[in-house]
Amino acid sequence: MSEHKTTEMLQEEAAKIWAGLEGKTLTNKDRFGIPQQEMPSQEPEVRAHNMSEVALGYTETQARVEAERCIQCPTAPCKKGCPVGVPIPEFIKHIQAGDFKGAIDTITTTNLLPAICGRVCPQEKQCQSHCTIGKMLKSPEKAVAIGRLERYVADWERANDKITVPTPKPDTGKKVAVIGSGPAGLTVAADIRREGHSVTVFEAFQKTGGVMVYEIGRAHV
């Protein structure tokens, strides 16, 4: 079993890599050589005594380094693997430029639940399975960590009070009922509201959230 690395250790490693990348015009060969950034997590001795989320999320430096691994493929095969069509190269390009607000705004054009999808989507079977970097390294687990980057900018938006609510189209006067307040139900409700319709969400249980509340568990989200 490999030694657990603290957030501080991973940040130090990322800072050394970033020092060699900052201000440099990178070739694809340079990008292939950047190691995937490991996700910081609670130390085993600590997480054994709590039910908090194990994964802690990238630091800003880690996110910048990881984003630089993306070679901005013209055909964007990663996007083809995303069920909701997130503009993946575009949001990663914003991260490369240090524009985290631009990154999250790009994601939310098609996905209003990036903090959830960044945590629980099976990226290794979807977007990352199509990533050119992953194919070059013969493993989707070594692809550009798209989900971790999505999570980073979603968490950054919340932590920095930068959340913006999409402006709906003019009211149509139509009313729509959505049954269930899980991720799917909330996504449908949000998309319908964006089109100008009035939406009421019905939930049978005491709390909203569906599988996020009743099945997945706090250790993962």
Enumerate the predicted regions with their spans.
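Residue-level detector of alpha-helix initiation sites
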Residues: 112, 182-184, 207
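Short acidic, glycine/serine/threonine-rich loops at helix termini
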Residues: 150, 190-191, 211-214
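Gly/Ser/Thr-rich helix-start
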Residues: 91, 183, 210-211, 216
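N-terminal Rossmann-like FAD-binding beta1-loop-alpha1 element of flavoenzymes
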Residues: 174-201
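Ferredoxin-type iron-sulfur electron-transfer modules and their immediate structural context
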Residues: 2-175, 205
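Glycine-rich FAD pyrophosphate-binding loop
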Residues: 197-213
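Conserved SAM/SAH-binding loop-helix junction
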Residues: 126, 187, 210
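Conserved small/polar residues in nucleotide/adenosyl-binding loops
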Residues: 219-221
